[in-house]
Amino acid sequence: MAWSLELRRRNCGKDANLQSEEIDEQHESVDLLIVFTKSMQLENMLNSLKPIISKDTYVLCLLNGLGHEDVLERFVTRDHIIMGVTMWASMMTAPGHITFANDNGNVEIQCLDPKGKDETQKIVKILTDAGLNASYSENVMYSIWRKACVNGVVN
């Protein structure tokens, strides 16, 4: 089953409509997979995406919480795992409709293995060009832990 997603950014007049395709055994592998699912759903989601994950696929993990790299290593090698943290808040206004809740968020990412740094820096550029204020971090785990501590208190 294919889905569509509408992204809306407040106060800047930018909307994006993204269309998905159903994933089946015939699909080619993807270069980059960005995961945002809930922690408890990560492994099942990755299992369902196996047909499009290859040895060349990078996975960018922007989930809240800790320990996701342990699950990711079951699907891709460490030099293809990019951990990250985002301060872009969003809300689902209806199924398939997402609105950014702030106008000045950012994304910090880092590959778990230095061998993947060059590719990760290319992804930083793509995210920045898309207006997501991305940067390469030399210690993204610090930021991930900091956000986990804040979320643990606030939520």
Where are these regions (language model features)?
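Internal alpha-helical scaffold of NAD(P)-dependent oxidoreductase catalytic cores
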Residues: 51-52, 74-80, 95-154
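Short linear interaction motif-like sites in intrinsically disordered regions of transcription factors
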Residues: 2-4, 89, 146
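Glycine-rich phosphate-binding loop and adjoining beta1-alpha1-beta2 segment
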Residues: 1-13
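Flavin (primarily FAD) cofactor-binding/catalytic cores of flavoenzymes
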Residues: 1, 47-49, 119
